[in-house]
Curated annotation (Swiss-Prot):
This is UPF0246 protein A1S_2267. It comes from the Bacteria. HAMAP family: UPF0246. GO terms for cellular component: cytosol.
Length: 257
């Protein structure tokens, strides 16, 4: 089983790291090409492209300028500890055991606009480049065209390395669009999380994002390898809804408190 999650806009480069083990990202030659494109943008152009404030745009212009592929702990940290958002609140990587991190390194991947596909212990310098950004580049008009099948091919390599034929999609639609489903050499399962509000069950963004992280943690801590095993997920009040699920989409509900 290989699980995919999205990255986060919010980053944490301050909290003390629980391990000094690390790996280097595997698609850095591609990242360097994107950095070259981004370095040509002014702060104002970044602000317009990313729909962010001048302050955030200036910060990221500086990050693009300072980026260099010689990553160490003076300028980078492991991806699983660097991202800080709703998904990562659910994942709570800082409290995973060593054996869990070892399992995650083989079975969890983070999609990234800049780095393509990250393993948990891959070092990364801070950045902001969302997958949906319409950044014109040497390969096309956006990041989906830039990455083309590169991410998909890497996923297939990672599936083969762990002898798995199951991909669990816990990523957002924006990021999952970077994966070419037709070329994935595995069964694909997507967990969906619905919360009850005013007597109706629906996807509530904040809760759904956190639930994806909780599911990733559930997979890691229990070292799951079969789609059937996912149905036992019952963290924080969620339960499997067999009636509304299919082989490709597993629905989990949580009743209003």
């Amino acid at each position: 089983m290989l699980a995919l999650i999205s990255p986060a806009k919010t980053l944490d480069y301050e909290t003390a790291l629980p391990t000094d083990e690390f790996t280097q990202p595997r698609l850095l030659e591609n990242s360097a090409q994107l950095i070259d494109v981004c370095r040509k943008l002014s702060a104002s152009e970044i602000a317009n492209l990313m729909s962010v404030s001048e302050k955030i745009a200036t910060l990221n212009a500086d990050r693009f300028r300072d980026w260099k592929p010689e990553f160490d702990f003076s300028n980078a940290r492991q991806a699983i500890y660097a991202f800080k958002g709703d998904v990562y609140t659910g994942l709570d990587a800082y409290h995973l055991k060593d054996k869990d991190i070892d399992f995650a390194q083989q079975h969890l991947r983070m999609l990234s606009g800049l780095y393509g596909l990250l393993r948990p212990l891959d070092l990364m310098m801070p950045y902001r480049l969302e997958m949906g950004t319409k950044l014109k580049n040497t390969r096309g008009h956006n990041l989906y065209e830039f990455w083309d099948d590169i991410i998909t091919n890497q996923i297939n390599e990672d599936l083969a390395a762990i002898k798995s034929e199951l991909l669990v999609n816990l990523a957002s639609d924006e990021y999952y669009k970077s994966v070419n489903e037709k070329k994935i050499k595995a069964e694909i399962v997507k967990p969906v999380f619905l919360d009850q509000k005013n007597s109706k069950y629906k996807v509530i963004s904040f809760y759904a994002k956190k639930a994806r992280g909780l599911m990733a943690r559930f997979i890691i801590e229990n070292q799951l390898n079969k789609a059937e095993d996912l149905k036992a997920f019952n963290t924080e009040g969620y339960y499997f809804d067999a009636d509304n699920s299919s082989a490709k989409e597993l629905v989990f509900k949580r009743d209003e408190q």
